[in-house]
Amino acid sequence: MADAGIRRVVPSDLYPLVLGFLRDNQLSEVANKFAKATGATQQDANASSLLDIYSFWLKSAKVPERKLQANGPVAKKAKKKASSSDSEDSSEEEEEVQGPPAKKAAVPAKRVGLPPGKAAAKASESSSSEESSDDDDEEDQKKQPVQKGVKPQAKAAKAPPKKAKSSDSDSDSSSEDEPPKNQKPKITPVTVKAQTKAPPKPARAAPKIANGKAASSSSSSSSSSSSDDSEEEKAAATPKKTVPKKQVVAKAPVKAATTPTRKSSSSEDSSSDEEEEQKKPMKNKPGPYSSVPPPSAPPPKKSLGTQPPKKAVEKQQPVESSEDSSDESDSSSEEEKKPPTKAVVSKATTKPPPAKKAAESSSDSSDSDSSEDDEAPSKPAGTTKNSSNKPAVTTKSPAVKPAAAPKQPVGGGQKLLTRKADSSSSEEESSSSEEEKTKKMVATTKPKATAKAALSLPAKQAPQGSRDSSSDSDSSSSEEEEEKTSKSAVKKKPQKVAGGAAPSKPASAKKGKAESSNSSSSDDSSEEEEEKLKGKGSPRPQAPKANGTSALTAQNGKAAKNSEEEEEEKKKAAVVVSKSGSLKKRKQNEAAKEAETPQAKKIKLQTPNTFPKRKKGEKRASSPFRRVREEEIEVDSRVADNSFDAKRGAAGDWGERANQVLKFTKGKSFRHEKTKKKRGSYRGGSISVQVNSIKFDSE
């Protein structure tokens, strides 16, 4: 990770280390498979082992520098791009993850918070991820997070972010998100108090979850890592949330996080068990919050109509994710997640700043994309906590965008697919919950934040999220599209002032698109879009007060249903056109087509008319081309027949006899016969010069 900025680290650099690590830990089968898959050879006995590198990372002093969020995301993005550049990288990382799990299990002391469950979770996740995640990148990231993890015990909130970084591209994004959270506590005394109070719980839940999750996420940059990261982030976020609603909020996020971990890998028994145990205490503490009615019922109750639709969206997303991964576990975990999210949301509604935290934490729980996006917003949220409205707006757009980003990854990237399979449900749920929280916060806080803050943050978040989301070339393409969409969203935001609301719209469109691309069903995406639109419609009235009508309010303000229908149609068309394409781009393209294409089409239609057309009756029979047609030429009778017999005076001429012989001779033999006639005893008689001459009258 640290070396990434100086020198581009290639995943193949770690193959020998991973192979040696696997063999050292009696993982011969995995080692053999890894060697076949990567063609790696045993490293030198004198070379440093993964354990040595890991211990060095723990001792490294470079970790604290990564807290910087301004430039950190870019570096992380570059790292993520490097890690996700090769599918082999992903496989290597997964295998490394498998190795590291054992390794980390062996070296729990180093891990600081690494419970045996973490190693087990890592192993299970790595196996379930099928060595498809980037082991090398993850290991590097893990190492860094481990270092951070050591500090995290001191600072529970900070530890989860760093661990998230260590996890994978996802962990990177999550770490980015979390650093902002750390900043938030510093910025806001309330959050600091929450951290101080919550730290014990966060330290327990966050370190355990963070470590277990970090292990699982690092074990596979795929869904497991994303879900784990999100859980870690949730744990971290929950402490922050706990500030206003310390126990309940933190517990609810933890619940969501634990459910995501289950989703991330159904095979992760140890991790899921630990999470469940954590969930139980968390649930007990949240009590009324956790007892929030099922997502379907409470959303309508909540002032923001967007929440129920979002929850519905979450449900739909879980269904889709369940298709990829264990359906039951995803749905159940999603359901569990939803109540906590609702609790958090309700709390958020009551307290906009907590809501922001909750939204951020939920976004963290979402994939690294969402977490990164959240990080950028979370920074502003922390920094501009005084202007909680701004953070709310920024968080809202980032949260929505992250949600969209995870969905796109699901549609486009291989890792994304795996992530979605394992943690797509958790990501989607978290993203949806984040969106709900953010939307609620926006509605409740009625962000007065200037569109500029929202725009700048969303822009940064969107690119970060997109880069994070890409662990493969496919994902990268989707990321670029996401970035573009986010940029477009940002652009639109300045136009319509309501930065928060505008970003949410593109995010929802992206979400819908990603879901439809996932092949869950265009209906699901449309429903989600509708829900989002509805939610947007409800919060917009509130948001307009602070921000004025946003792009969403402009398009959907008149009627959420109309906008929903339009968006659904557009999304469906967009899904058909290109899964990775951003809805905004498509919308723009559609608008351009409506304005330009018709003319172009008309021109095209008209152009054929400019060429002369043959009359149907004039069709000429197909015949070989003749430059000179016999029927069109008049030949002088004197020249019409050029044979010797046709000449005047031919009869009785000296050449008549020769003609009798030569007229039947063709080709090479003709010259031979002619020569014989000239040299032989042939006597034709007197020669008349005038016999064959023809005089043409000059005309």
Curated annotation (Swiss-Prot):
Post-translational events: Undergoes rapid and massive phosphorylation/dephosphorylation cycles on CK2 and PKC sites. NOLC1 is one of the mostly phosphorylated proteins in the cell.
Region annotation (Interaction with RPA194) ranges: 204-382
Superkingdom of the organism of origin: Eukaryota
The family this protein is said to belong to: Belongs to the NOLC1 family.
Compositionally biased spans, kind Low complexity: 100-110, 144-159, 193-227, 236-261, 398-409, 441-476, 498-523
Bias (Polar residues) ranges: 381-397, 547-556
Phosphothreonine: residues carrying this PTM: T188, T607, T610
Record organism: Homo sapiens (Human)
Cross-link Glycyl lysine isopeptide (Lys-Gly) (interchain with G-Cter in SUMO1), sequence positions: K415, K572
Record cross-link Glycyl lysine isopeptide (Lys-Gly) (interchain with G-Cter in SUMO2), residues: 67, 76, 186, 193, 342, 347, 390, 396, 401, 407, 415, 440, 452, 505, 579, 604, 613, 647, 663, 695
Omega-N-methylarginine carried by residues: R683
Stretches the record annotates as 11 X 12 AA approximate repeats of an acidic serine cluster: 84-566
Compositional bias ranges of the Basic and acidic residues kind: 627-637
Signal peptide: none
UniProt-annotated location(s): Nucleus, Nucleolus; Cytoplasm
Principal localisation: nucleus
Chain positions of Acidic serine cluster repeats: 84-95, 125-136, 167-178, 221-232, 264-275, 325-336, 363-375, 425-436, 470-481, 519-529, 555-566
Record protein name field: Nucleolar and coiled-body phosphoprotein 1
Gene name of the record: NOLC1
Pfam family, one: SRP40_C
Biological role: Nucleolar protein that acts as a regulator of RNA polymerase I by connecting RNA polymerase I with enzymes responsible for ribosomal processing and modification. Required for neural crest specification: following monoubiquitination by the BCR(KBTBD8) complex, associates with TCOF1 and acts as a platform to connect RNA polymerase I with enzymes responsible for ribosomal processing and modification, leading to remodel the translational program of differentiating cells in favor of neural crest specification.
